[in-house]
Each structure stands twice: as C-alpha cells, then as structure tokens.
Regions:
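N-terminal anchoring/stem segment of glycosyltransferases
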Residues: 1-49, 157
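A structural signal for well-ordered alpha-helical segments within the folded catalytic domains
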Residues: 4, 18-21, 25, 67-74, ...
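Active-site-proximal specificity loops/subdomain of glycosyltransferases
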Residues: 39-65
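Conserved catalytic core of nucleotide-sugar-dependent glycosyltransferases
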Residues: 97-148
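Catalytic core and acceptor-binding pocket of nucleotide-sugar-dependent glycosyltransferases
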Residues: 131-199
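C-terminal catalytic/acceptor-binding lobe
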Residues: 190-243
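Conserved small/polar residues in nucleotide/adenosyl-binding loops
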Residues: 254-261
C-alpha cells in the first residue's frame, strides 16, 4: 500500500499564494487522516547533487522540485502534489497501486500528482538519473528539460503507449486524463466526469516562457489534429523564444517517439 502521506514543495521562502492555500485546504478536507509534509530549504539537502545545487543558485525552484518530489516518494512513499492541485474527493483509491499518476493530455504523463510506495524501482531510476546531470551547461545556458519529458522518456523505454488509456508500465499505473487532470492545459476548460478525483489548475509559477507561449499558441491551432497540435505549438514556441537552431535541438525523442506511436 502507498502510505497516507501527502508531499509538496515550497522553495524560495515566499508566502503561499491564495490558490495554494485553497488547494491545501482541500487536501485536509478530503484526506483528513493523511500526514501532509512540506519540503523546503530546511529539510532537504540542496547540495545532494550538482543539478540541485545549480538550480537553487539560479533560483529555478520548479527544477529543484523535480528532484525533491522523486526523493520524497522514493525514501518515504506517499502522494506528491503540486500546490495548485485541488482535491475533489478522497484519494484512498490510489493507495492500492505500486505507483500511480495519470495523463495530463492524451499523450503526456503529468507530474503534478504522482504517488508510489517507498523504494519503487522506476521512481528510483528516475531519481538517480539526476545524479549525473548539471542544470547549468558549460556554455552557461540552463538545462530546462522538464521532468515530464524525462519521465515520459523513461516510460517509453518500458513500453508506454501515449494514448490516454489505463496502463501499467514497470509497476507505474497511468490513469486516463479525467481521473486526475480533467482541466485542459491547452484551453483551460474543466471536463469533469464521475471518475475525477483532482484538478490541476496549472497556476504557472513554474512555467517557462517557452511553455507559456506554446500553451497560448496551442489554443489557436485547433485546425490541427489534437495528436500533433501540442508538438507543433512547442516547436513554434521554441523558434519564437530561442531561434530556429535551438528549436531543432529541442525536438526531443519523447515527441518523435510519441507521434510515431500515434501514427501507427
């Protein structure tokens, strides 16, 4: 069983915004017997590896959180939630899994809500991937590869099919989008069903300029098939923000492999 523990991260020392306070209250309402643990500068080793140290020096809190959420789940087990995730009903049904999350779109694995048992092998693998990484590249630029990309890449290696259907990959169960993420990242609408347990509100404090531009552009590309709309928006956003050469470098194995799977 996954333990009744909710983890969240808050680095930088600023007060929690109103939405975060509201969401945490919803956790307490529907999960009253769960321990809630905040991870911050006081209880996490910011020198645990070069990636975390460099991300903290750059004040890129979201990328520190990418590591901390994995560390919390691997070492203690439980449910990790971003502070903009609202709980709609009890989460006990998630506790029976070895590890669980759900689709953020029809093709993307979200990281705003993830859960696993202590020591889950895939999550350990994902955590240790950061041990050999640097957040600051030799040329001074920052590696802003999201954990969505890293986790999706790892799952593709184990047979993940990006098609918004329930599946289990190396012990990691993925639920359809309506369970944990019924709010569309692209159009902002909420599509609740009887399955919906949480809403990720995408507050965007962590969102890069590239992601934010891609999100807005995606809303205008409705003439494109949904299966490729996000990829086109992300590529065009990279061109807009970073130039064509950088955009070409940013075309990830994740996007190519996912599109290939959808087309087959």
């Amino acid at each position: 069983m996954i333990p009744k523990k909710i983890h969240y991260c808050w680095f930088g020392g600023n007060p929690l915004p109103p939405l975060a306070v509201k969401c945490i209250e919803s956790w307490k309402k529907y999960c009253p017997d769960y321990e809630i643990k905040e991870w911050n500068e006081s209880n996490f080793d910011l020198n645990c590896n070069e990636y975390v140290r460099e991300a903290y020096e750059a004040k890129k809190w979201a990328f520190i959180t990418d590591v901390v959420r994995l560390y919390a789940m691997v070492t203690e087990g439980g449910i990790y939630m971003d502070t903009d995730v609202e709980v709609l009903r009890p989460l006990d049904d998630l506790l029976v899994y070895e590890a669980v999350s759900g689709f953020e779109t029809k093709t993307r694995i979200p990281t705003g809500l993830m859960a696993c048992r202590e020591g889950q092998p895939l999550f350990e693998e994902l955590l240790h991937e950061y041990d050999g990484l640097h957040f600051k590249r030799p040329d001074g630029s920052l590696d802003v590869t999201t954990n969505v990309t890293r986790i999706t890449n790892a799952c593709l290696k184990y047979g993940f099919v990006p098609n918004n259907t329930k599946q289990t990959v190396n012990g990691f169960t993925l639920l359809p989008q309506d369970y944990l993420c019924p709010k569309s990242y692209e159009d902002g609408k909420i599509y609740l069903t009887e399955n919906s347990m949480t809403i990720h509100h995408f507050a965007g404090s962590w969102v890069s300029d590239v992601d934010r531009y891609a999100q807005e552009l995606g809303k205008k590309l409705t003439f494109l098939p949904e299966s490729i709309r996000g990829y086109v928006a992300m590529f065009c956003s990279n061109v807009h923000c970073n130039g064509f050469a950088a955009a070409c470098k940013a075309v990830s194995y994740t996007h190519l492999r996912a599109h290939e799977t959808l087309m087959n």
